[in-house]
UniProtKB/Swiss-Prot annotation:
Keyword hit for DNA repair: yes
EC number(s) stated in the UniProt entry for this protein: 3.2.2.-
One GO MF term attached to the UniProt entry: alkylbase DNA N-glycosylase activity
HAMAP family reported for this sequence: 3MGH (MF_00527)
Family: Belongs to the DNA glycosylase MPG family.
Keyword Protein biosynthesis included in the entry's annotation: no
Pfam families: Pur_DNA_glyco (PF02245)
Name of the molecule in the record: Putative 3-methyladenine DNA glycosylase
Organism: Bacillus anthracis
Top EC class, one word: hydrolase
GO BP: any one term: base-excision repair
Keywords from the UniProt entry: DNA damage, DNA repair, Hydrolase
Length: 205
């Protein structure tokens, strides 16, 4: 079952934690690629100095952050790596959750090809398929084309995992500072990164 629009409403930190254990799905050329979300970071503009929308900054890139919750915000870093975010909070409140890492589930062969251009990979390469925001976007074929797309779409959405299959019973949710935001002054220390402690696909321990 797809997460309904109401799933993305409410406090961004709570939505971030709710996203853990759910399945991010992207259909590419009719083939389902997916992964279980194991690591996220919350960004709470306009007061969060780490957020692209800090101070209410409104640009062509960030405009989607000011829109309705439950849409995709995709951007490039270093001019080459895509990052996928879920927009949260009410219209006009520019907040979102960065998906930092996944455990691959569906379309494994396509994911391997997308990441390594081959399907015969080592155990170390397998562990590196989706353990970072840029890696998971490449693996799932998420690009700037997906910016602004509703997560109610048939081709890009979050699937809710039934409680009996949910991995939250196997891993403890841990909170800590976000990664690679040295520019963000006091916001560097906000414990707004949430992840499954000990999960092999988490990007950093």
């Amino acid at each position: 079952m797809q997460a309904p629009p109401s799933f993305y409403e409410g406090d961004t930190l709570e939505v971030a934690k709710k996203l853990l254990g759910q399945k991010l799905v992207h259909i590419v050329n009719g083939i389902k690629r997916s992964g279980i979300i194991v690591e996220v970071e919350a960004y709470k503009g306009p007061d969060d100095k780490a957020a692209h929308s800090y101070g209410g900054r409104r640009t062509d890139r960030t405009e989607v952050m000011f829109g309705a919750p439950g849409h995709a915000y995709v951007y490039l870093i270093y001019g080459m790596y895509h990052c996928f975010n879920v927009i949260t909070a009410p219209v006009g409140t520019p907040q979102g959750v960065l998906i930092r890492a996944l455990e691959p589930v569906d379309g494994i062969e396509e994911i391997k090809l997308a990441r390594y251009n081959k399907t015969d990979i080592t155990k170390a390469q397998y562990k590196n398929l989706t353990n970072g925001p840029g890696k998971l976007c490449r693996a799932l074929g998420i690009t700037l084309e997906e910016r602004g797309v509703s997560l109610q779409s048939d081709t890009l959405h979050i699937e809710l995992v039934p409680e009996e299959k949910h991995i939250s019973s196997q891993y403890k949710i841990t909170a800590g500072p976000r990664i690679n935001i040295d520019y963000a002054e006091e916001a560097v220390h906000y414990p707004w990164r949430f992840y499954y402690e000990g999960h092999p696909f988490v990007s950093k321990k």
